[in-house]
Amino acid sequence: MSIDLPALFFSASGRIGRLRFWIGALALLFLGDSAATFLRSWFAPGIQPQLIDFAVTALLAWPDFCIGRKRLADRGRGIFFALAYTGYSLLAALISIFWPLLSEKPDGSFESSLFLAAIYTCTLFFVVECGVLKGVKGPNAYGPEPTLP
């Protein structure tokens, strides 16, 4: 099994199966978490940790979009779903910066619980849509069926 990493992370065309999606998503998760941890220790305590998290998320937005776009194309989903996939990550990271300023209530408040429920619902949707469900059999509008799952 050979994976073209530049195409996986930097090309938004074509389709990928679940295996390549998980490899790419977990690689980005590891890279993003490692970079954020390093940057937090480098800049701490002078900068808000959520700001670093947003910066890392923004830097990884294009590779994240490419992986999500190709996997969602395999599922027969259009560009709207791919934009929502990446936009959701950016929006969640951005809201985490301003949430303490906007919410004067404790973390256990109804608004906090509602926000977390929305985050978890979106996360669950994309995990199932991209990582669990099979792609469309045969060629579709986005290209031929991937050779690997």
What are these regions (language model features)?
Residues 31-61, 88-125:
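Membrane-helix interface segments in multi-pass membrane proteins
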